[in-house]
């Protein structure tokens, strides 16, 4: 459940906790709002992300959370080692696999130009593309790079299938024949925005592999953020919201590096606060810190949460704190770590520091052993939920409360 600290909702059928006031938020300019996102990391030490691409087209397949009358994309070179030269980009409606709907392909420009060079450490929005898209629609964003990219900025563990081509510019091709190779990651693309004045704003699901949907079915769009997005679509116009992914597998609050991404403290502004139209963030983060360092003191994690809350509130963004799931039986489970998890969860529930609390621990735990995930919700590794577990999490969130935080 979500518990809210807003006086305006005292009459609502949700428990009330104390919490900090959130500054007033300005409307997103021109009604742009994020519909899809993926947090990026540095290239791996080996493999495709390390070698990068030359004279190839990457076809990233993404799934919208809300629709809109036009769109724009954001390409990232945040973790590149040299300028990223993009020669051609197209966006189309995806039909099946790497195939796109005939006639739906649109050229994407940057400042009116077909090509763009993005300095290393930077990212770039495209111009608006007049392509109407629906909620829960698959898009194919095809990015052609002629020159060698060097190590690539990417999102590993996408839990979705994308593609890359044989040599050449195949960005505008509707056929899948030039895309024989599957990749289970998103390269370069880190955001898609749409114009939709009926959407109140965006909710960012920020965290580690559970926020990213590990344990859910590949290509099924059954992460908890997908389930939540489907629920909020049923709200009246003006109260609906998009749901954006800012989860990274193996990510930690306090430490960072490699394909686990920068620490939550380091990446929070880029991956959460800078999302277009963001109004609220659900923070589900800390499990990996505890697993790797069970000797941490609760105050170390609590201080990090407080810092994230301060950052969000300074930009008028509400923060929902999610309790950490039980993980007895997981590879790095320890009794010491479980005590730390319980201490942190008590603070999340009872401190009043968050604007609301999502008690995912209560949803997922075995009622007969609170250190263990309920078997019906366990993906099998005792750490990540399965599809049913993610659906249960999404179902536990009071969407009326969430809508209040987003639109209030």
PLM regions: where:
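Conserved SGNH/GDSL esterase-like catalytic core that processes O-acyl groups on lipids
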Residues: 36, 54-60, 83, 87, ...
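Positively charged n-region of N-terminal signal peptides that target proteins for export
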Residues: 1-4
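Proline-centered loop/turn at the N-terminus of a beta-strand
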Residues: 242, 316-318, 356
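Sec-exported extracytoplasmic/periplasmic mature domains
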Residues: 211, 229, 233-237, 273-277, ...
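N-terminal secretory targeting modules
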Residues: 7-206, 216-218, 237, 405-407
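Active-site segments of SGNH/GDSL-like serine hydrolases
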Residues: 284-289, 308-342
